[in-house]
Regions:
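Proteins synthesized as precursors that undergo proteolytic processing into mature forms
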Residues: 1-134, 138-146
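In a subset of proteins, long, contiguous C-terminal domains/tails are tracked
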Residues: 130-180
């Protein structure tokens, strides 16, 4: 019997190359006893009395941390409901070779007639403050507005009466259900 548990496709979080183009070892190369650099960040939040308050997690590669942090800040600091926190627009900052870029992901807006997620249109339609976008661009940040696959955050929240409330990001195929 092996102790531990499987972390789904975590092997793919290792670097696919063991050395760089100059022959130098890559720190994130697979090796016995190593764990990969990973962005998996399922989070469990407890209240000050140590009781379960909520849990949040999302798919999304190295954007997972931002998705999960956004929901935690939204609920704890801003007092949002689980669904309001899941629906917030996402702002993902990246830097490579000293050059930064910011990707903004549309708020999950569902067309009530077609039940489709609307992902195109002016940034303001998606809950992104156009003044903040303009300010970031004026500072030299490369802003891209994502229309593709984005956050799929799910939240389970414990209400004061002990019942549970769930939320799922409308931008992906997830949903909330109850099993009795």
């Amino acid at each position: 019997m092996v102790k531990g548990f499987m972390l789904n496709n975590q092997l793919t979080d290792f670097s696919f190359k063991s050395v760089d183009d100059n022959g130098n070892p890559i720190a994130n190369a697979p090796a016995p006893g190593k764990r990969p650099r990973s962005s998996m960040a399922p989070s469990i939040v407890f209240n000050p009395d140590g009781q379960f308050l909520f849990t949040s997690g999302s798919p999304g590669g190295n954007s997972i941390i931002a998705y999960t942090a956004k929901t935690i800040v939204g609920m704890i600091d801003w007092g949002l409901t689980p669904q309001e926190a899941a629906d917030l627009p996402n702002v993902i900052a990246r830097a490579r070779n000293g050059k930064g870029r910011v990707r903004m992901e549309a708020k999950g807006i569902k067309d009530e007639e077609t039940n489709e997620i609307i992902r195109t249109g002016p940034a303001a339609e998606f809950g992104m403050n156009p003044e903040i976008v303009a300010e970031l661009e004026a500072m030299g940040h490369n802003i891209s507005k994502s229309k593709g696959e984005i956050s799929g955050v799910h939240i389970i929240y414990r209400n004061a009466d002990g019942s549970l409330t769930g939320a799922a990001d409308k931008r992906r195929e997830g949903s909330v259900g109850v099993v009795e």
